[in-house]
Each structure stands twice: as C-alpha cells, then as structure tokens.
C-alpha cells in the first residue's frame, strides 16, 4: 500500500501533501505550466527590462536578437509538451500515467539557459539596425563588428589621433546594400581630422533605423559628387577599412585598385607600395592625350618629390620609365604613345608624324640597314631590284637595341636639324661603328630582305671540301670489296659541280670611300642576273650529298656486320665436327658435338 501511495501521489518527488484527486492535480499543474510559458513568450516580445517567475530569478533583457528570440521561445513552448505529454484522451477519459517531473525547476533551468544565450548573443553577434537604443559601452564593439572579420585591422579599432589615410573606400554592408547602394566613408588628407559627414555616418549606427536611413542617404548624396583637386580617389572592389597613413596600400596588395583620376600632389607616405601606385597613376594619365598636356608639370613635380622621398630606390627604376613621357608632351603625343605601348611600330609612327621630312633616295647594297640607322624616314632602294619605283620605301624592322639607341639619339634633335646633323661625317662614322658592333653578320641580314631581292648564300669553304675528300678516302679503306666500293671510287659523284664550275656568287667588294665616312659610300654588290641566283638556290635544294654519304656509311657498316657473322658461322660449323682433347676431362657429361660458348 505504501508503494502504491507513493506512486500515485508522487511523495518521493514532491514534499507537499498528496492530493486526493491526483488526476485533477496533475492536469491543473500542466495547465499552469502552459499558461506560464505563454505568459513568458508574451513578455519576451515586450520591451520590459525583466520578468520575475514566481519570485525566483529574472528572465532576459529586452535587447536581444529577434531571430534567436523566436527560436528560443519556440523551444520553450515545445518543452512542456515533451516533458508532460497530455493528449485529450488522457486528460478527459482513459488511464492516467503519473509524470515524475518538476515543472517549476525545469522552468527555472530554462530561464537561466535563456539568459546565457541572450548574453552570448549580445557579445558575439553583429548588432542589427532594427534594435532600439543600445548601451554606450557596446558601441565601439559594434562599430568594429561593422567590418567583416578578415578586413579588420588593429589600426581601425584604435586610432588616437582620429586621422585617416588619403584614400576613399567603399564600406559594403548588408543593410546599406539593400537601402542606398553604397555607403562611402569620406577620407581627406592625412593631416586633416575626420570630416563632419563621416562623423555623422559613424554616429548613425547608434540611432533608430529611420534616422539612420535618412542620414545615410544624405551622406551618400554628399559624397557622390565630383572629386576635389589634390585628392586621389581610389575605389576598391572589396571592403578596405580606413587606416593611418603608415598603413597605406602595402599591407593589402590583393585588393584590386582602379584609379579614376589623378592630379594630386606628392603622396603622404614614403613606402615603396605608394610609389608603385603613383607610378601606375602616372602611366594611366600620360597615356591619355587629352590629359597629357595639362598634367605634365604636375607629373614632373610628382616625380621629383618621389625621388626625394623614396630612400631605398626600389621603385625609381619604374618611375624613370615614365619620365620621357612627361618630357615629350609638347614635342609629340604620338611618339610617346607608340614608345610606351609597343616598340615594333615606332618606324610607322615616325613616318606619320613627319611626312614632309624626306630626303632623296640613298643607294644601299645590304638592304639599307645603315641608312635606316641614320634616320627611319630615309628611303632606301636596292640596285638589284629594278622593278621598285622611286616612291617605294624599303624599310626593315630593326632589333630592339638599335631602335632604343636610335630613339635616344633622335630625342635631343629638333625636327628642323635632325637630318642635317645626321648627314655630317662625324655622325655617320659613329653610326657605322655602332652598326659594326651590334648588327648581325652579312648572311643573316641578307635573309631578312623581301622575296624580290636576290638572296646571298654562303659559298662552300674549300676547307670543307678537303675534309670531305679525306673522310671519303678514309671510309673507303674499311669497306669490303663490293659494288659499294666501286660506287664510292667515283669521286665526281660527291661534287655537284666540277672544280671551277661553281657559279659566281658575286660577293660585295667594299669601296675605298667607305673608310672616309661619307653617307654615299655604301658597299655595292657586283651585278649579276636573277637566273644565277635561282640556279644556286635550286642547287642548294637538290644537293643531297651529305644524306647519300650518311646512307653509304650505314650500309657499309651493315655489310661488315653481315660478313663477320657469316665468317663466324662457317668457323662454328668447322669446329663442330672436331673433338677437342682438353674438353673430355672436365666435361665428360657433355655429348659429342656440344661445346661451351668459349670455344666459339
């Protein structure tokens, strides 16, 4: 009986007096738990500071995340059903199974867990704009949480002087993308404090959402105007937080930077990354011909200030590449643009810029390479090609070194006296020495000519012919007596032409006046017809003497191998019939006729 009483009334769990009607007692307690939790969920949505449950412990505070509040409320609303499952059949009619649970203690435990979750929510997660008035102690933390974790720098959180670097960045926010597109944080020079509009944009985080939306739109309208003079406006594709002047762009080189305009003064920091950044700015501005004339003095000043500021000289080499562009803005824009982009089309750009500066035709024997070194506009005409008209310009692409040297020499000359200065004997002699040091050999230069111009081919050296005859005589000694030796005995087969019957190649003979340095004294080749040239090319294509000689050597080697194998086979057959006396002692088990491989 005692066990039944304890089971029905729950004396072991509740210290109170057992009720006479246990069904009514438990159903009332479950209904109280339901009403209790519904009251808690209603109180959680109201902005009340705290709620007391039965005088035990306070629940949660009002500023909590709305998403997590609903989730927690739904969990608490579902918890009593899991603890006390009371279907309608068991409430009204049916058997009753006593539930050994303490609803009051369970509610207290849930309230404690709820408070811990709310504290973790306010400290770890990002503050939403839909919340009301926030505490003043948590404002710096929420401002630091405004940036993504991977973009937060220590300079962003602690800035004692309140100054920012000289760049404008776009702060991407989830809420600002939906409302007003982009929210720009304005940044002035490194010596100026934070502007009023930026301060208002920072204070807008602690206000209600409507005021923040209105002020955010005004700040975006103020910053979307034209940039002022003396500023570099850099728009970064990823979020780049504002920082001190010593941070600059060097610590985050992975962010792609797009320069929109640059008429600025010297940069505020002295790091090499800023120098390279200004180098790209100078290059982009100088490539635009409309901005080139206006920003030339400023670019020159900027280059001078950068030379003074950069101590290590890491980026001076790249900045010097843009120096001729700033110097030649008034002389010619086309020359600067073609020199910057590609060196291959420099001759065409010179032809377009100076069409009226053309001198009479200069005769050139080896395709006029010396005349082109003197001036790219001088017309050249080959004496062997009579089909070309005097108006044609025979110009060949020069190597990169000769073009750079030519541009350096032509840079100091004006358009009026460049040809007169180059026509002096001193200048032409210098050019001849330069060509002798840097030009390829004669046969290489001749191959660059056009198909209409005859091609000079190197004549076979008599030393090579002597080596061929010696090698053939040496190989004939090793050949067996066969038809191959008879074929090689005819030495005339190895020479395509008999001795003295080779066509005249017409090598150029230098004149005596070329030593004096006159521009007209150019080497002239001896006159010869095109038939001889094409006959020589045909002879070169059809001459397969080396190939035939190689095949003969291979065949002779194979013949020697076959003959030696045949001799060994004959010797083996002869030895097989004989019996050697010294093999019978150690090899008595071997049958007659089977011998070891050493006897072969």
Curated annotation (Swiss-Prot):
Q: What happens when the gene is disrupted?
A: Male mutants are infertile. They have smaller-than-normal testes with reduced diameters of seminiferous tubules and sperm density. Female mutants exhibit normal fertility with no apparent defect in adult ovaries. They show a strong reduction of the follicle pool.
GO CC terms on record? chromosome; site of double-strand break
Q: Where is this region: Required for interaction with HSF2BP?
A: 475-600
The segment annotated Required for nuclear location runs over: 1-150
Record-listed Phosphoserine modification sites = 79, 191-192, 195
Q: Where is the composition biased (Basic and acidic residues)?
A: 143-154, 199-215, 330-344
**Keyword Phosphoprotein attributed:** yes
**The keyword Membrane is assigned to this record:** no
Protein localization: Chromosome
Source organism's superkingdom?
Eukaryota
**Name of a matching Pfam family:** Brme1
Tissues in which the UniProt entry reports expression: Expressed in testis.
Q: Which GO terms describe its molecular function?
A: damaged DNA binding
Which keywords are on file for this protein?
Chromosome, Meiosis, Phosphoprotein
Region listing for Disordered, in residue ranges = 1-98, 117-239, 315-394, 432-451
Which terms does the UniProt entry file under GO BP?
Answer: double-strand break repair involved in meiotic recombination; female meiosis I; male meiosis I; protein localization to site of double-strand break; reciprocal meiotic recombination; spermatogenesis
Q: What does this protein do?
A: Meiotic recombination factor component of recombination bridges involved in meiotic double-strand break repair. Modulates the localization of recombinases DMC1:RAD51 to meiotic double-strand break (DSB) sites through the interaction with and stabilization of the BRCA2:HSF2BP complex during meiotic recombination. Indispensable for the DSB repair, homologous synapsis, and crossover formation that are needed for progression past metaphase I, is essential for spermatogenesis and male fertility.
Its assembly, as annotated, is: Interacts with HSF2BP (via N-terminus) and BRCA2; the interaction with HSF2BP is direct and allows the formation of a ternary complex. The complex BRME1:HSF2BP:BRCA2 interacts with SPATA22, MEIOB and RAD51.
Q: Please state what the protein is called.
A: Break repair meiotic recombinase recruitment factor 1
Q: What is the lineage of its organism?
A: Eukaryota, Metazoa, Chordata, Craniata, Vertebrata
